[in-house]
Amino acid sequence: MDSDVLTTLKILIVGESGVGKSSLLLRFTDDTFDPDIGATIGVDFKVKTITVEGNKAKLAIWDTAGQERFRTLTPSYYRGAQGVILVYDTSSRETFDKLEEWLTEVEMYSTKKDIIKMLVGNKIDKEGREVDRKQGLQFARRHAMLFIEASARTREGVQLAFEELVEKIIQTPGLWEKDGTSGGVTLTAAGSQAMSGCSGMYWKALSDLIRQFF
């Protein structure tokens, strides 16, 4: 049933805890918003198939924890990822100032040298903005990143963020083509073990879920 899918892509969402990574993911995949959603523990994972400029791609989207205590899981997150969304909260200058650290992490652990990076300024619906659009755009340009402002609450910019990221990845064949075939996403045994510290049952379930799709 997936014979018309051009490729399968691994996308990461990273950033400080509380910037709305999970909310962006749920808005994009399920079109839902929960104002009381809790912090991600370790990593969450969802699959969504989208069509961009006539090309159908299956996305395996990893929503990562922003807490320092989960950083030991980092190498497993980045392995094989073709795209990463770095998120900050436009109403929190601190989350914007932390972007340099997150970008350093991306560049350190990414196994794809041409990984496409998208910067998303989330929560533009909130009052008390501390980071204006120009600052976000300048940061993105300085680091050769795509850029958009969004609101998971109102939907604004969410779909477009993922579509533009996927479009750019597809325009970079070396990221997803291998020996003439589309790239795949796998959860290795080493990766499963590296992440098992959070919850063995959780990661077994996650591993089983991934195998259903890939």
What are these regions (language model features)?
Residues 57-70:
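Switch II (G3) loop of P-loop NTPases
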Residues 61-62, 85-89, 119-122, 150:
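Conserved beta-strand segments of the P-loop GTPase G domain that flank and frequently precede/overlap
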Residues 16, 30, 35, 89-92, ...:
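Short, conserved catalytic or interaction motifs in soluble domains
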Residues 1-18, 22, 53-56, 110-214:
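Conserved P-loop small GTPase signature centered on TRAFAC-class small GTPases
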Residues 46, 71-76:
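Conserved alpha-helical scaffold flanking the Walker A/P-loop in AAA+ ATPase domains
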Residues 30-56:
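Switch I (effector-binding) loop of TRAFAC-class P-loop GTPase G-domains
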Residues 81-100, 110-114, 124-130:
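Conserved Switch II/interswitch segment of TRAFAC-class P-loop GTPases
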